[in-house]
UniProtKB/Swiss-Prot annotation:
Its main location: nucleus. Residues 1057-1076, 1091-1116, 1220-1230 have a biased composition (Polar residues). Transmembrane segments: none annotated. It is found in: Nucleus. This is Uncharacterized transcriptional regulatory protein YLR278C. PANTHER family: ZN(II)2CYS6 TRANSCRIPTION FACTOR (EUROFUNG) (PTHR47782:SF12), ZN(II)2CYS6 TRANSCRIPTION FACTOR (EUROFUNG)-RELATED (PTHR47782). Residues 72-100, 770-804, 864-971, 1031-1116, 1220-1240 are annotated as: Disordered.
Length: 1341
């Protein structure tokens, strides 16, 4: 038996293609012919088969469809073989008089197997075209076909095969397949099948085919598969539903041969091979686009219907926001290009010898390539826009961009400044929609603004300039893009507002020549939208520059209390813009887009100052609502679109979500301060069950949905999604922990509203209605929403935009913002079909008791009709009923008011009466319960009877906030007052223990809360340390910065448990017993503000001299973090020293990020996205410089405080670990511990007496945490909890600390080995184990 035929897999062929692509011109590297003896080509050597040495390619390479890589002695073998056969060699292909075969340069299926069907994108459309660029004579073509057939049929095929080699037989088969295609009618099923089976080989032939009128395809290279982000598009194009559309396009293009001559001429201008194009002279060369975009095949054939839809999409969906192009100029060149009306001067090497048409237009070669490249850029952008509908049937957008970049490369350095601005701006609009890092956007727009400012001086107005209108359009378009990108990535502006002296648009400047004639003369939507957008952007730029919100070094930014008047002033400017904006003058889609711009500006203004406001403050609620509106708008967009994203949108959604989380943590800290001022000794404050809480959770759900959808569409969003997910884990874990038995609840009693003067700069009734509901507390936010909605009715009468707090929830929310997605992006017929399917699903799967919760068809229409009014009928009715109910507050109950807190809000008598009524009813119920159940009073220390005078003596009032004569800003209470606007409003609370303080399954929830927070803490700190490393590498650590730094692969020094982060470790827990004060009595611990250890009491020299060298390393990241000893930090510490030791309302910005990273968290466990972020320009540089940096660090600090509290809490450890699995029992017995610890202490010259004291001291566990051996190995706190009793570590200790003794080092590694169970529980959860172990879901791991 002979050897079986060798089957070569397509994977090996594809692998060889990729090797050829990477090798480029260095194919000798692949040959590896060191001695120069090889005569076979690369493929035949790899297959170990005989090569026939044909030119220009051997038969095996032709069949495989790859480039024939030939050694130096390949030609000698060919010359010997040519003496024995008649096959032509290189350059011997004679010119043929028959019509040439024109193939469209679409996706090449070079590597496809002969028996494998390719996609429609890979089809080669065959059309007969003569050499004179004229129509093919059908009679001549048929006569030629008959002649060829007669020759082939009259001869004996067996005799012919004896005289022919495989090369000739292969070419004859290709010729027969082409003739078969000519006989078939285009569009039929057989034609499509034959076309899909055809494999191109002409790109492997010689370049000396000068008689062909079509361009030679030798510049085509072996192309890899598209990127993963484009695979959904490729799959959609391969569906059977696209066959008809593709065949229709094929037939249309076949019948329109006369209009394709310009395309042939365009392709002939790109006749040079790809490797000969000098991309270093291209205007895009500096942005590293060659490697990512030039690997795709260009497109030269143009479908008229699809291309015209591209232009219409661009000028309807982008031109009104960024009027960069002249619409008439684009359409004129497109018409010339499509109908072959372009004439290249004779000096051009690509000039056709045929006579030009009579109506042709002359273009120079540079001008032609510029206009062509610009047009193909528009096509690529529009292709991405059309992909959002899910109905796009064209080529992938990167292929249009590949054509554009080849045209632009031909221009070289001959582009003027205006052309450079247009091309670079279009490049920004394209890259925004690709899976690219945002840093490249800032680099491009910075160059564009530099050209506009320094070269063309577009920022100055010259009315006598004949091109003044075009320059105005160019600059404002670049300005809007530059402002949007700078805010998204957190980079400083490239041009100041003071340098801009330009008017807004009018009809003459906005509309281009010839287009405005068809536009309406009054109420032009385009001018109205672009002018309002410019006004809002200029207000935003003013407060960004004044408040210095965007700086090169974000750590130098100072947000102080003194800036709050400026914040209120700029917010007033935004309010003036909002009220003056008329929603009736613009389309619904443009109106919703401006809403997004407004919400984005409000969030950007208030977010850095959130910690200075109370949660009930107007600005706090506006910022929180604006962030929620942003998340909801983007959720609606992704809900109604199937594809599409933008990198600035990823930043916007992420920062909005982090802002919402930050607001929840600030509200928690504020409630903790209120509770502790009342003398409550509980550990936590129960979260208030309010409408605001559930509204925020709904907005966070929308943000999470958006980030997950964006990650599915773009790999760039993965880091943002994972970071937000860890923040949510920490937040939810903290909410669970606060609902435990050791927590107290704040009960809002009443608010006595003082009379106030009318606020200044408020002239309309709408603003009065808005400002009247400012003091509504979270516990009664439902009434607040009703009142604000009822009063916001006045807004719709003057056509102004509603504020961010005027929101619609539930069924009407999606319909309210439905206009955010343009109608062209939504298929109405498909929507109706989807609604019918949804109705069937409701009937079959949804229980009848829940069916009423879903939005019905009639409800949708009713809601959409009333969408212009910003309230629903239910909210208005509830607000009217609530406003009509008024009750007097009894004097006996006024004695029960526990705390007076001044709010800087504008009060409303109706709202306060409603709250008094609601809380009056609740208070009466509480009194009845207290009278009936005396045991509740004895068990609840914080629930005091109404007639108890001792409770009144314990009530506290913040006197510093009661100064109504001056404008006072008190940080600890986050309260502001302005004398000319408002009067102090006193909200009164009591503290009450919950009645259901013992839950049967609380231990499970407590364990979940702890593990969830601890895992989130580790992951957050890993993200912060790894993503921000590149930004700090250029900074040299100072002397002071080396104090508190630790190796990134070891356990850094933790932040104090309940104190604000300090630039030094918690030294009170590092020293032996004789230098640490005893735990404070209970009476003194109730006033912990007198015993906070100041970090500035320690001497840097003493600290550094006493610590081991291996304990602290010079990590440049943490060095830069802890070295920021500014006056702001000192002032912040002074303020915090005089107040509470609870979790601060704002962690020190200069002393952030790294608190503790587990030792097990090495570089091997860091996610791939994080590792990639460390190399080069990554999203880590911009992830934390756009406003989220400060918030993430503070949240990480507060989460770390909760985790350290849990680690030092005996009750929690007993809950998490049963008696048989306590950390102490997991390691060794007590005698072994004492023996080992005595040996360690004797080695370090520590007496046995001191050791016995330190062993029983709770701070000894902290000492072990800071210990390190000679190899620099550090141990985490949780690794040492087993070595001693689990006693509470007091966070608030006061002592004069001295560094007299050197801390002993740990040299035994057995502790870490025996702590594996503890570490496994702390670093992983059961969910991860399920996905790892379960075989059914193994494909997900």
């Amino acid at each position: 038996m002979g050897r079986p035929r060798k089957n070569v897999s397509q994977e090996k062929i594809q692998q060889l293609k990729r090797e050829l692509e990477l090798a480029g011109n260095r194919t000798d590297v692949l040959l590896q012919d060191k001695k120069g003896r090889s005569r076979s080509c690369l493929l035949c050597r790899r297959r170990k088969q005989r090569c026939d040495h044909k030119l220009p390619s051997c038969t095996a390479c032709l069949k495989a469809g790859i480039k024939c890589v030939q050694p130096s002695k390949y030609s000698s073998s060919t010359s010997n073989s040519n003496t024995n056969n008649n096959t032509p060699t290189a350059g011997t292909v004679p010119p043929t008089p028959h019509p040439v075969i024109k193939r469209e340069l679409q996706d090449s299926s070079i590597g496809a197997g002969a028996g494998a069907a390719t996609s429609l994108n890979d089809m080669t459309i065959i059309k007969p075209i003569s050499t004179s660029n004229s129509n093919v004579d059908a009679g001549d073509a048929n006569e030629f076909r008959k002649t060829i057939k007669s020759v082939t049929t009259n001869s004996n095929p067996n005799l012919m095969r004896q005289d022919k080699d495989q090369y000739t037989i292969f070419l004859e088969k290709k010729l027969k397949s082409l003739e078969t295609l000519l006989d078939l009618s285009p569009g039929c099923n057989q034609y499509n099948y034959e076309l899909s089976q055809y494999k191109k080989v002409s790109h492997l032939f010689s370049n000396n085919t000068s008689d062909y009128s079509r361009p030679n395809s030798s510049n085509m290279v072996i192309l890899p598969l598209p990127s993963p982000s484009n695979k959904p598009l490729e799959n959609t194009n391969n569906n059977g539903s696209n066959v008809n559309a593709a065949t229709n396009d094929t037939s249309a293009s076949t019948n329109n041969i006369n209009n394709n001559n310009a395309i042939c001429q365009s392709a002939s201008l790109l006749n040079d091979p790809l490797e000969t194009l000098d991309f270093t002279k291209c205007i895009f060369a500096k942005y590293n686009l060659k490697k990512e975009f030039l690997m795709y095949d260009p497109i030269f054939e143009l479908n008229e219907k699809l291309s015209r839809s591209f232009l219409d999409t661009f000028f309807t969906r982008l031109q009104f926001k960024y009027p960069i192009l002249d619409e008439q100029e684009i359409y004129t060149f497109y018409d010339h290009y499509l109908h072959n009306k372009i004439l290249i001067p004779p000096s051009s090497p690509a000039t056709s010898s045929a006579a030009p048409p009579s109506n042709s237009h002359s273009y120079s070669e540079i001008e032609f390539h510029f206009l062509s490249g610009r047009m193909w850029l528009v096509f690529s952008i529009s292709a991405y826009l059309l992909m959002t509908t899910g109905k796009y049937k064209g080529f992938p957008p990167h292929r249009y961009f590949s054509t554009a970049i080849r045209h632009i490369t031909k221009c070289g350095l001959h582009l003027n400044y205006v052309q450079q601005i247009e091309l670079l701006t279009l490049l920004v609009l394209y890259i925004i929609r690709t899976d690219r890092d945002s840093l490249i956007l800032y680099d491009i727009i910075k160059d564009v603004m530099g050209i506009s400012k320094k070269k063309l001086h577009l920022n100055q107005w010259y009315p006598n300039d004949p091109f003044a209108n075009k320059k105005l359009r160019l600059f404002w378009c670049v300005y809007l893009l530059e402002r949007m990108i700078c805010v998204a990535v957190g980079k400083p502006y490239t041009i100041k507002e003071s340098e801009i002296n330009l008017p807004l648009f009018n009809n003459d400047s906005f509309y281009t020549k010839g287009v405005h004639a068809a536009a309406p003369s009054t109420n032009d939507h385009g001018v109205q939208f672009i002018n309002q957008s410019l006004k809002l952007r200029r207000i935003e730029s003013q407060f960004v520059e004044t408040l210095q919100l965007l700086k090169n070094d974000s750590r130098s930014v100072k947000q102080s209390i003194d800036q709050l008047p400026l914040v209120r002033k700029f917010f007033e400017d935004l309010e003036v813009w909002r009220k003056s904006y008329s929603t009736l003058d613009v389309k619904n889609f443009e109106n919703e887009t401006l809403k997004l711009y407004y919400y984005r500006s409000v969030r950007l203004l208030i977010q850095p100052y959130l910690e200075f406001f109370a949660p009930e403050d107007r600005l706090f609620r506006e910022c929180q609502a604006a962030a929620g509106q942003i998340c909801q708008l983007y959720k609606i967009f992704h809900q109604k679109t199937l594809n599409g994203h933008s990198t600035p949108a990823v930043h916007t959604v992420f920062v909005a979500g982090v802002t919402l989380i930050y607001c929840m943590w600030l509200a928690r800290n504020f409630d903790d301060q209120r509770r502790k001022k009342l003398g409550d000794a509980s550990k936590h404050t129960r979260p208030l069950i309010s409408a605001s809480l559930f509204s925020t959770m709904d907005d966070l759900r929308a943000c999470s949905v958006c980030l997950y959808v964006m990650t599915e569409r773009s790999n760039f969003a993965r880091t943002f999604r994972d970071t937000f997910d860890q923040l949510m884990n920490a937040t939810v874990g903290n909410l669970i922990e606060r609902c435990g038995p050791d927590s107290s609840e704040l009960i809002f009693m009443a608010s006595s509203v003082a009379k106030r003067t009318e606020p200044k700069n408020i002239n309309d009734e709408a603003n009065k209605a808005i400002s009247s509901g400012d003091t509504l507390h979270d516990s009664n936010s439902a009434n607040a929403a009703n009142l604000s909605n009822s009063n916001d009715k006045n807004i719709s009468h003057n056509g102004g935009m509603p504020p961010a707090v005027a929101r619609i929830f539930g069924k009407g929310q999606a319909e309210e913002h439905a206009g955010f997605v343009e109608n062209s992006q939504v298929d109405l017929a498909e929507q109706e079909k989807f609604k019918k399917k949804q109705g069937v699903l409701e009937k079959t799967s949804v229980p009848k008791s829940l069916a009423h919760l879903l939005t019905k068809m009639d409800d949708r229409s009713r809601i959409s009709n009333s969408s212009m009014s910003y309230t629903t009928s239910s909210s208005s009715s509830s607000s009217s009923s609530s406003s009509s109910s008024t009750l007097s507050f009894p004097s006996s109950q006024e004695k029960n008011l526990k705390i007076n807190v001044n709010n800087d809000n504008n009060g409303m008598t109706i709202s306060s009466v409603n709250r008094e009524h609601n809380n009056n009813h609740n208070n009466n119920n509480d009194n009845n319960n207290n009278n009936n159940n005396n045991n509740n009073n004895s068990n609840n220390n914080n629930n005091v009877n109404n007639n108890d005078n001792e409770s009144n003596s314990r009530s506290t009032t913040n006197n510093s906030c009661n100064n109504g004569n001056n404008s006072q800003y008190v940080r600890n209470n986050n309260v502001t007052m302005e004398n000319d606007v408002e009067r102090p409003i006193q909200d009164q609370y009591i503290v009450k223990k919950p009645t259901n303080q013992t839950e049967f399954d609380w231990q499970v929830f407590q364990q979940q809360a702890f593990l969830q927070q601890q895992l989130a803490q580790h992951n957050l700190q890993a993200y912060l340390s790894s993503l921000n490393t590149d930004t700090m590498t250029n900074r040299s650590p100072s002397k002071s910065s080396s104090i508190s730094t630790a190796s990134s692969h070891s356990d850094p020094i933790p932040i104090a448990m309940t104190q604000s982060p300090t630039p030094y470790p918690q030294t009170s827990n590092m020293l032996p017993q004789q230098h640490v004060s005893r735990p404070l009595p209970q009476q003194q611990r109730e006033q912990p503000q007198q015993h906070i250890t100041s970090p500035q009491r320690f001497s840097e020299s003493n600290f550094t001299n006493q610590l081991n060298n291996g304990m602290i390393n010079s990590n440049p990241l943490q060095s830069a973090i802890f070295s920021n000893h500014t006056s702001e930090n000192k002032q912040l510490r002074d303020v915090e020293e005089s107040n509470f030791s609870t979790s601060p309302l704002r962690a020190d910005y200069g002393n952030n990020i790294i608190s503790s990273i587990p030792a097990s968290f090495t570089s091997n466990s860091i996610p791939v996205s994080v590792k990639q972020a460390r190399n080069g320009s990554s999203s880590g540089d911009i992830l934390f410089s756009n406003g989220a940096h400060d918030m993430i660090n503070n949240i990480s600090t507060w989460t770390n405080n909760s985790v350290l509290d849990a680690l030092n809490s005996k009750s929690i450890l007993q809950t998490i670990f049963p008696q048989s699995q306590e950390p102490s029992s997991l390691s060794m017995d007590k005698q072994q511990q004492q023996h080992q610890q005595q040996n360690m202490c004797s080695e370090n010259n520590v007496t046995a007496n001191n050791f016995q004291q330190t062993q029983n001291d709770p701070s000894y566990n902290r000492n072990l945490f800071m210990m390190s051996n000679q190899e620099g190995v550090q141990y985490n706190l949780d690794e040492t909890e087993k070595n001693g009793p689990k006693t509470q570590v007091e966070a608030n200790t006061s002592a004069n600390l001295h560094f007299d003794n050197v801390i002993p080092t740990v040299t035994n590694a057995d502790i870490r080995k025996k702590r594996s169970n503890w570490d496994n529980m702390m670093t992983s959860g059961p969910v991860e184990d399920f996905w790892t172990i379960n075989d059914d879901y193994g494909f997900l791991t």
